[in-house]
Amino acid sequence: MAKKIAGYVKLQVPAGDAKPAPPIGPALGQRGLNIMEFCKAFNAKTAQMEKGTPIPVVITAYADRSFTFEMKLPPVSYFLKKASGIQSGAKTTGRGFIGKVTKAQVREIAEKKLPDLNCQSVDAAATMIEGSARSMGLQVVE
């Protein structure tokens, strides 16, 4: 028989830098999960990744206080910032551009993120990522 699911916890944790401090500690403590066990397992899985990369994690908490977790790829904004070389997005969207990304870079990001997005084709994913780029204040050029 399958374990009874008690709930889900969604977090964004820096790769290789999971600590029992907030936001991880309180989120897992509420569900009665072993915080250090998660931190060690997460840090071990993300050891080969670039340290500090934000990794979205979905933790499935079970009624017997055990858990499993699934890691996703970093957010689109992380890839766009890296591709354009900016530190943060525009303060006000639609009032000029603070950087540029090429359609080739957008397509490359779309190919990476396709499993995490709710679309079937790379073209649809590229369109979504272009919209994210524009809302961050990035100009999409040929």
Swiss-Prot record:
SMART domains: RL11
SUPFAM superfamilies, alphabetized: Ribosomal L11/L12e N-terminal domain (SSF54747), Ribosomal protein L11, C-terminal domain (SSF46906)
InterPro entries the record matches: Ribosomal_uL11, Ribosomal_uL11_bac-typ, Ribosomal_uL11_C, Ribosomal_uL11_C_sf, Ribosomal_uL11_N, Ribosomal_uL11_N_sf
Pfam family of the protein (one): Ribosomal_L11
GO BP terms in the entry: translation
Keyword set includes RNA-binding: yes
Post-translational modification note: One or more lysine residues are methylated.
GO molecular function, one term: large ribosomal subunit rRNA binding
NCBIfam families: L11_bact (TIGR01632)
HAMAP family: Ribosomal_uL11
Subunit composition and interactions: Part of the ribosomal stalk of the 50S ribosomal subunit. Interacts with L10 and the large rRNA to form the base of the stalk. L10 forms an elongated spine to which L12 dimers bind in a sequential fashion forming a multimeric L10(L12)X complex.
Entry similarity comment: Belongs to the universal ribosomal protein uL11 family.
Protein name (database record): Large ribosomal subunit protein uL11
Naturally occurring in which organism (per UniProt): Beijerinckia indica subsp. indica (strain ATCC 9039 / DSM 1715 / NCIMB 8712)
